[in-house]
């Protein structure tokens, strides 16, 4: 074969290849959708279903929470040993706020920052402050005391928000301090102060000695485990908890340096 013939045949083959269809490895037959798009649609359906379920759950919890009448909290004021937070020394209120809910005056019933901080404290074995706000604890202690379910926690948030809308902070703090268990069948702060120390939390009282800074810190530290912490025989863990509370009270300006040092001296005797 001549060289010119070989060249001519090569050109004819090249021209033929140009007109042939080219298929790549991603070719899909007509009418069959790509697998990626199908997977994406399934994922979106799953996410949408989850969102609908969550929305329905929240809606049901909100409806159930409306059965709890926050007006009933006023009944706490009828207790014989009730003392309003307005009539307590600042360091008494500060002992509980520092330990349980240091952002009490800045939130509206739920504190995401405080809850997150409490979670990390628990993880690092520094369980000093609870994750629930004082308002949430008021709701739990009054309406859901024996309920430990997740649904209770959700309802608690809705009711706590209503409590914050209806009552001022001192009223909420009063409900808390007069409806919490201190051990030995004591459910008010005044009753606990009378029972354990022979003192009163009423700053206007002239018949009894007023509760001290240390005594306030002890009672505030006890409510976390009232049946475990023994005031008459304080464990190392309980003592450390009280010490931490006193330090927090000083940091948050509920007590000054002199009061702090005096309380620490009494604690370490």
UniProtKB/Swiss-Prot annotation:
The Swiss-Prot or TrEMBL record annotates one GO molecular function as: peptidoglycan glycosyltransferase activity
Its membrane topology: Single-pass membrane protein
- The chain's disulfide connectivity reads none
> Where does it mainly reside?
membrane
- Transmembrane annotation, as ranges: 46-66
Lineage: superkingdom = Bacteria
Is Membrane included in the keywords of this UniProt record?
yes
Query: InterPro entries in the record, alphabetically?
Result: Glyco_trans_51 (IPR001264), Glycosyltr_51/Transpeptidase (IPR050396), Lysozyme-like_dom_sf (IPR023346), Monofunct_glyco_trans (IPR022978), PBP_transglycosylase (IPR036950)
Please provide, in alphabetical order, the Gene Ontology terms of the cellular component aspect for this entry. outer membrane-bounded periplasmic space; plasma membrane
| BP GO annotations | cell wall organization; peptidoglycan biosynthetic process; regulation of cell shape
Record protein name field: Monofunctional glycosyltransferase
Q: Which organism is it from?
A: Staphylococcus aureus (strain Mu50 / ATCC 700699)
Q: The organism's lineage?
A: Bacteria, Bacillati, Bacillota, Bacilli, Bacillales
Gene from which the chain derives? mgt
């Amino acid at each position: 074969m001549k060289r010119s013939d070989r060249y001519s045949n090569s050109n004819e083959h090249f021209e033929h290849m140009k007109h042939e269809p080219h298929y790549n490895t991603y070719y899909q037959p007509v009418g069959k959708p790509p697998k990626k798009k199908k997977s994406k649609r399934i994922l979106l359906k799953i996410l949408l279903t989850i969102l609908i379920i969550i929305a329905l759950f929240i809606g049901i919890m909100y409806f159930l929470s409306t059965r709890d009448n926050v007006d009933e909290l006023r009944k706490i004021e009828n207790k014989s040993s009730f003392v309003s937070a307005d009539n307590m020394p600042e360091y008494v209120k500060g002992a509980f706020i520092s330990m349980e809910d240091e952002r009490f005056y800045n939130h509206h019933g739920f504190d995401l920052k405080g809850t997150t901080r409490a979670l990390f404290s628990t993880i690092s074995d520094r369980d000093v402050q609870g994750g629930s706000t004082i308002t949430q604890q008021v709701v739990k202690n009054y309406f859901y005391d024996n309920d430990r379910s997740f649904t209770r926690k959700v309802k608690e948030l809705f009711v706590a928000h209503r409590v914050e809308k209806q009552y001022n902070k001192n009223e909420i703090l009063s409900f808390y301090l007069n409806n919490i268990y201190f051990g030995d069948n004591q459910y008010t702060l005044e009753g606990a102060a009378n029972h354990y120390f022979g003192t009163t939390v009423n700053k206007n009282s002239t018949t009894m000695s007023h509760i001290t800074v240390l005594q306030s810190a002890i009672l505030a530290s006890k409510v976390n485990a009232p049946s475990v912490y023994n005031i008459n025989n304080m464990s190392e863990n309980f003592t450390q908890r009280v010490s931490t509370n006193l330090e927090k009270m000083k940091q948050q300006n509920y007590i000054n340096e002199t009061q702090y040092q005096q309380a620490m001296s009494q604690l370490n005797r």
